[in-house]
């Protein structure tokens, strides 16, 4: 295991935001020891060419199996660095991002994940403002260390430990202790596939780390900014996708071995299934930022999420086998 931070960006055919993200990493006050771009099932050579021509110090690899968590696991295998700091291609890292991450992990070997404060890069459009009003990726100004701080109230409510999987950060800026995550089996490749499950890999690994007895630190000194989607429909779809993926992840957790107790998982799953209805009532009273039609769709998405994980596992296996088959044909041919 090599000391230091590898900053990893998983991307697919998005050269313009990727260029901006890479520039933010090149401008760190304490630069990461390594910067890695994982090009996930690209449609052409544009990303590879851009990295080669404009960022010669950045390492490029191509992961042929489509799916964000295939790309994340590829990053874990590609680097030998102790810490892998994942950042989405639509994120701009603050100048102290990498250094603050390194400082957090130096506090204790028990810390497996560090998340940070993610603010909006722009609030120019109605879609961006709606996403931020719904909560965005902000998690506040107070440092949180789990499980030590688990008895704090989350959004004013006492909650089970699994609730912190959505209350302590976001995958758009998430750093992990590489060996620990590999020992836990890596990211779940059945999540973040697009349809039927377009998210959930970050929530799943946050929960599995907590359930395994490791620590997570949310440190607002780890600062980044995220470019929210500009159109209202796109922002609403992202919110709905998040809720469907959350329910699928919770349903998976409810039937998986659980060291910290299944009752809290089941209780939180039941609450999240009911919550869109509660929000709809709040909206009718004028107290929820999302329109009523979006909350109705959210409720339906949550219930569909209950049965999505099994289908997503089958899809992940088909994608894996398809790529393996093409490789075997190429070698044999």
Labelled PLM ranges:
Residues 1-26:
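N-proximal low-complexity "stem/linker" segments adjacent to membrane-targeting elements
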């Amino acid at each position: 295991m090599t000391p230091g931070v590898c900053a990893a960006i998983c991307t697919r055919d998005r050269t313009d935001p990727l260029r901006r993200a890479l520039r933010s990493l090149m401008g760190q006050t304490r630069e990461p020891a390594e910067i890695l771009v994982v090009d996930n099932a690209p449609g052409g050579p544009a990303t590879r060419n851009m990295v080669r021509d404009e960022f010669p110090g950045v390492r490029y690899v191509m992961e042929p199996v489509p799916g964000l968590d295939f790309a994340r696991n590829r990053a874990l295998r590609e680097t030998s660095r102790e810490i892998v700091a994942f950042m989405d291609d639509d994120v701009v890292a603050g100048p102290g991002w990498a250094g603050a991450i390194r400082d957090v992990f130096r506090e204790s070997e028990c810390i497996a994940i560090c998340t940070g404060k993610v603010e909006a890069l722009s609030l120019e459009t109605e879609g961006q403002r709606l996403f931020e009003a719904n909560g965005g990726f902000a998690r506040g100004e107070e440092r949180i260390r789990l499980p030590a701080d688990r008895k704090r109230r989350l959004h004013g409510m006492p909650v089970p430990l699994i609730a912190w999987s959505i209350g302590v950060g976001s995958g758009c800026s998430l750093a992990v202790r590489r060996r620990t995550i590999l020992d836990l089996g890596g990211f779940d490749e059945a999540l973040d596939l697009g349809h039927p499950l377009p998210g959930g890999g970050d929530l799943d690994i946050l929960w599995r780390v907590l359930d395994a007895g490791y620590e997570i630190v949310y440190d607002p000194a780890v600062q980044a900014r995220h470019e929210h989607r500009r159109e209202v429909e796109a922002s609403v779809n992202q919110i709905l996708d998040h809720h469907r993926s959350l329910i699928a992840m919770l349903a998976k957790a409810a039937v998986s071995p659980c060291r910290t107790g299944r009752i809290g998982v089941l209780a939180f799953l039941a609450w999240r299934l009911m919550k869109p209805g509660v929000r709809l009532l709040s909206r009718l009273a004028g107290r929820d930022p999302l329109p009523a039609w979006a909350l109705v769709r959210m409720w339906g998405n949550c219930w569909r999420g209950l049965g999505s994980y099994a289908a997503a596992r089958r899809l992940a296996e088909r994608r894996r086998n398809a790529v393996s088959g093409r490789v075997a044909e190429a070698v044999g041919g």
